[in-house]
Amino acid sequence: MPLYESVLIARNDVTQQQVESVADHVASLIEAEGGAIKKREYWGLRTLAYRIKKNRKGHYMLLGLDAKPATITEVERQLRLNEDVLRFMTIRVEEIDDVPSVILSRKSDDRERGFRGPKPPGRFESGRKRGYDDREEFRARAGGDDDDRGLDQE
């Protein structure tokens, strides 16, 4: 049987368990026709590139499928009918890797390096911290006290 990879995006207001139940439904459809699920990854709640059906975020799920083309057609029909699924895409692949996908490996790399690191200084910042009072520094450079302003002359 040919191999397929399917990515589906579910609405952001559903829970992870509901997304897993959609994947379980797909798995039951495929296994009923003699196919198998080779890979299953939950990518988490991610920001969409643009709004889809008034949603800015969605739960992503990757499925590696081993099924007949007629079964894939039925799975896609069921996904179209499911209101929780915003979008899906199924493509035919030569092989399904057992290693985690690039999306999952990138998430772990971000955690290891502290995500983004410290914020660099802005274009117009002098490097001083906010709330820095430079009056003490000015007085030290001027070499005088407040009494040397010439206001005491009467």
UniProtKB/Swiss-Prot annotation:
InterPro entries linked: Ribosomal_bS6 (IPR000529), Ribosomal_bS6_sf (IPR035980), Ribosomal_S6_plastid/chlpt (IPR020814), Transl_elong_EF1B/ribsomal_bS6 (IPR014717)
The record's GO CC annotations read: cytosolic small ribosomal subunit
Task: Write out the entry's keywords from A to Z.
Answer: Ribonucleoprotein, Ribosomal protein, RNA-binding, rRNA-binding
Q: Tell whether RNA-binding is among the UniProt keywords.
A: yes
- Organism superkingdom: Bacteria
Cysteine disulfide links: none
| Alphabetical list of CDD domains matching this protein | bS6
GO process annotations (BP): translation
Q: Which GO terms describe its molecular function?
A: small ribosomal subunit rRNA binding; structural constituent of ribosome
Q: Where is this region: Disordered?
A: 107-154
Q: Which SUPFAM superfamilies match?
A: Ribosomal protein S6 (SSF54995)
The answer to whether UniProt assigns keyword Ribonucleoprotein to this entry is yes
Q: Where is the composition biased (Basic and acidic residues)?
A: 125-154
Q: Which Pfam families does this entry report, sorted A to Z?
A: Ribosomal_S6
Record's function text: Binds together with bS18 to 16S ribosomal RNA.
UniProt-listed NCBIfam families: S6
| Family assignment from sequence similarity | Belongs to the bacterial ribosomal protein bS6 family.
Q: What is this protein called?
A: Small ribosomal subunit protein bS6
What is the species listed in this Swiss-Prot or TrEMBL entry? Granulibacter bethesdensis (strain ATCC BAA-1260 / CGDNIH1)
